[in-house]
Amino acid sequence: MLTLKIAVYIVVAFFVTIFIFGFLSNDPARNPGRRDLE
């Protein structure tokens, strides 16, 4: 039961981190580094 709760917290933290990174990357400019990578 404890490992299940830890796994749930890890998954939630993972999605929250992805959401925060996506929001920060889209906030200042619209895709600033994509043309440099291509």
From Swiss-Prot:
InterPro entries documented for this protein: PSII_PsbI, PSII_PsbI_sf
Highest taxon in the source lineage: Bacteria
One Pfam family this sequence matches: PsbI
Keyword Transmembrane helix: yes
A GO BP annotation: photosynthesis
Coiled coil (residue ranges): none
Keywords: Membrane, Photosynthesis, Photosystem II, Reaction center, Thylakoid, Transmembrane, Transmembrane helix
Membrane-related topology note: Single-pass membrane protein
Membrane spanning residue stretches: 4-24
Cellular localisation: Cellular thylakoid membrane
Keyword Transmembrane helix: yes
CC terms in the record's Gene Ontology section: photosystem II reaction center; plasma membrane-derived thylakoid membrane
Similarity comment: family membership: Belongs to the PsbI family.
PANTHER family: PHOTOSYSTEM II REACTION CENTER PROTEIN I
Subunit structure, interactors included: PSII is composed of 1 copy each of membrane proteins PsbA, PsbB, PsbC, PsbD, PsbE, PsbF, PsbH, PsbI, PsbJ, PsbK, PsbL, PsbM, PsbT, PsbX, PsbY, PsbZ, Psb30/Ycf12, peripheral proteins PsbO, CyanoQ (PsbQ), PsbU, PsbV and a large number of cofactors. It forms dimeric complexes.
Function field: One of the components of the core complex of photosystem II (PSII), required for its stability and/or assembly. PSII is a light-driven water:plastoquinone oxidoreductase that uses light energy to abstract electrons from H(2)O, generating O(2) and a proton gradient subsequently used for ATP formation. It consists of a core antenna complex that captures photons, and an electron transfer chain that converts photonic excitation into a charge separation.
Name by which UniProt lists this protein: Photosystem II reaction center protein I
Originating organism: Nostoc punctiforme (strain ATCC 29133 / PCC 73102)
Top-level taxonomy: Bacteria, Bacillati, Cyanobacteriota, Cyanophyceae, Nostocales
